[in-house]
Amino acid sequence: MGPEQLQRFKLPTIMHIARDLTVMESLRSLRCPAYVLAHKTSVTELGPVIDANIAAIHDKGRRLLSCLTDGMTADQWLYAYCRQEGIHTHDPFRISVTQRNFLHLSGWLVDEGQVALHHDLCVSRYSKV
């Protein structure tokens, strides 16, 4: 398989969760004898990998939602999530990745109607629906 073909089948990273879930589901229709995954392992059945990835996204969403107390700001919610998950880093890169993932997951929860976003004098606050 050439570079052009590989690029066509490249999976998205956690940037837009609803789209990522749709793309993962669409991969079920591929009929290849084997698949090379991101970490250079190969599998012959893609279904279990797709199921595990979808389950992991939903699990992260549930864990993030469990940390939300109505009226929290994004910073408060992220802080509560990091405490719950035991994320104790001072590395700027890891912090930025955690913040990015939080923004995508919290945005997905808002889009899915599980969380409401309220704006009050330039401060955004979240609450469970």
Spans of features found by a protein language model:
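C-terminal regulatory/interaction regions
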Residues: 63-129
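Metallo-beta-lactamase
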Residues: 1-61
